[in-house]
Amino acid sequence: MAKIVGIDLGTTNSLIAYLEGGRPVIIPNAEGSRLTPSIVAFTKDGQLLVGEPAKRQAIVNAERTIRSIKRHMGTNYKVKIDDKEYTPQEISAMILRKLKRDAEAYLGEKIEKAVITVPAYFSDAQRQATKDAGAIAGLEVVRIINEPTAAALAYGLDKEGHQKILVFDLGGGTFDVSILEIGEGVFEVIATAGNNRLGGDDFDERIVNWLIENFMEEHGINLREDKTALQRLYEAAEKAKIELSSKLQTEINLPFIAMKGNTPLHLSYTLTRAKFEELTYDLVEKTKEPTERALKDAGLSPSQIDKIILVGGATRMPCIQEWIKKHFGKEPQRNVNPDEAVALGAAIQAGVIGGEIRDIVLVDVTPLSLGIETLGGVFTKIIERNTPIPVSKSQIFTTAADYQTSVEIHVLQGERALAKDNISLGRFILDGIPPAPRGVPQIEVTFDIDVNGIVHVSAKDKATGREQRITISNAIRLSEAEIKRMTEEAKRFEEEDRKRREEIETKNQAEHLIYTARKTLKDYGDKVSKDIVQKVEDKIKNLEELIKPERINVEQVRKGMEELTQTLGEIGQFMYQSAGSTAGNPGQGQSTENPGGKTIDGDYKVN
C-alpha cells in the first residue's frame, strides 16, 4: 500500500511527514531543510520558484513574490502575475506540489494521498479550498485535520493515563486554542476557539510600521511606497522578532534603503524587547478571549488543565509564554517542537487511516455553529459549536408567504445573532413546492458535517415525500471543471520545471565539454595538424553560440556537443597513430628482431 503522508500547510512554513516504524518522521526538502517557506515566486524569465529559492530572491523580485497565501484561502482573492490570475488554491497547490515532489525523491516512491492540516477555526469554505489545493497538486486529500488536534496527537502518542490538555496554536497567520481529553488511545476534543486573522505576521507588521514611522520622521520618505524596500523591512522585522525571543534588544540595519536626491540613506534602529511588547500588547490581548471562551465551553477552570502544548513559531515570544504561565499557573510543555508538532500529528493520523496505527481514536468538533437566516435577518443555529463530528441534524422549515412554490435557505457559520455578521456558506434554492397557505408546507433540511469538517446539505418536502435537490451557489468554491483545469495547468508548470532543469543540466554539460576541449587544445594543439585544431575551434564557437540564449534548444545543443566530441576524438586518433608510427620504426631504439622466432626467457639474479 502506498504511503499516506501528513502535511502541515502553514502560513509561513510548510512541512511534510510520514510514518516509519510506527513513528512520525519529518521529510527534508530538496534544499536539505525540514521547513519549506510557504513562498511562491514567478521570475521574469518564466521560472516558478517555491520555498527557499523563492524566499532568497524576494527582495529583488518583490512584485512577483507571494507569501502568506493561506490568509486568503476560502475567499475570492486573486494574485495577478503578468496577464494571468491565480487563486489562493492554485498558489497553495504549488507549495503542496513542491512538498510532494521532494518527498517522492526522498522516499523513492510515488505519493498520491495525504492528510492536510488546517486551523481549527477554518470555515467550511476555507476547508474546501484546502481540499481543492490538494487536488490541483495531484493529491487525494483523505482527511482534513485541525492543527491543534494534530499537535495533541504528536504529544500524546506515548502518554499513559488521562489528561486534559490545552493546545495554544499561534502560527504565522492564524490563532487556535483547543482543549482535549486524552487517555488510553482516545483523543477527544471538547472545545475549540480561535481567530483566523491573528498570527506572527501581525507582530511583524507592527515592527514594520514602527520602522516606517521612524524613518518618515527622520528623513521625510515613506518606505511603504517602495515595494523592494518594504520587502527588506518585512524580512528584517521577522528576523528582529525572532532575535527578541532570546535577546533583550536587537539592531535593525538596512543600508541603502532609499535615496534623497543623490544621497543614499541607511536605516539603523535599536528595538528593545520592552518596546516590541509595547507595540504588540493588544495582539497578545487578542489571544485571551478565545482562550477564555474555550475554557468556558469545556466547563473547565485554568487550574483544571493538566498540560499546555505550544504550537507555532510565534509561541516562542516571551510575552506569549509569560501570559500563559501567569494565567494557568504552570509552565507550558517544552518537549514539543512548535514548528513540527502539527506535521508529525498529521502523519500519525495518516497512519491511523492507512492501518499502520490501530489503537488511536480521534474525536474532533466543529469550531463554529451552523445554521440559517430566518425572518428578520436573524441567525438560527442548527448545529452548535463544539459539537463532535461527524454529525447530522435536521430541522423543519416552512414558507413565509401564501402559495409560495420555492424558498431560499441561506446557510451560515458563526456565533453572531444577526445573519449578516456571520460567514455565508451558500444559498440553497428549493423549488417545486405545492402551492399552499404560508406555514403549511413542511420542508425538512438536513445539515451534515463530515470528518473533514465540511458541510453537506439535503432537503425533503414532507408533504409529497419527494426529496429535492438543493443548488449551492457559493462563488468561492471551485467547480470540478475549474479544479480539472487548474490541475492541468499545474501539470504544465511541472512539465515546464522539468524542461527548465533539463536545459540547465544540458547547458552545464556543454560548458564542461567546452572547458575540456580548450584544455585539450592547450595541451596537445601543437602536436596535431592545424586542420584538426581549426575544426575543434569551430565546433567550440558553434556550441558557445548555441548556449548563449537564456532558453536554449536542448536538441541543438546536444547535437553541437556530439559534433565537438567527435572532433575531439580526431585529436586522440591522430595522437595514437603518431605514437604507433613511432613505435613501429626499426631505425629508432633497439632491434625488434627475434632470431629464430623463439621465445627468449629472461634471466634474473637475486643478490
UniProtKB/Swiss-Prot annotation:
Give one Pfam family, short name only. Answer: HSP70
Q: Which residues carry this modification: Phosphothreonine?
A: T174
Compositionally biased region (Polar residues): 577-594
Q: Where does the record place the region Disordered?
A: 577-607
Q: Which UniProt keywords apply?
A: ATP-binding, Chaperone, Nucleotide-binding, Phosphoprotein, Stress response
Swiss-Prot/TrEMBL induction comment: By stress conditions e.g. heat shock.
- GO BP: chaperone cofactor-dependent protein refolding; protein refolding
Superkingdom is Bacteria
InterPro entries documented for this protein: ATPase_NBD, Chaperone_DnaK, Heat_shock_70_CS, HSP70_C_sf, HSP70_peptide-bd_sf, Hsp_70_fam
**UniProt GO MF annotations:** ATP binding; ATP hydrolysis activity; ATP-dependent protein folding chaperone; heat shock protein binding; protein folding chaperone; unfolded protein binding
| Family indicated by similarity | Belongs to the heat shock protein 70 family.
Function per UniProt = Acts as a chaperone.
The name under which this protein is listed is Chaperone protein DnaK
Question: What species does this protein belong to?
Answer: Dictyoglomus turgidum (strain DSM 6724 / Z-1310)
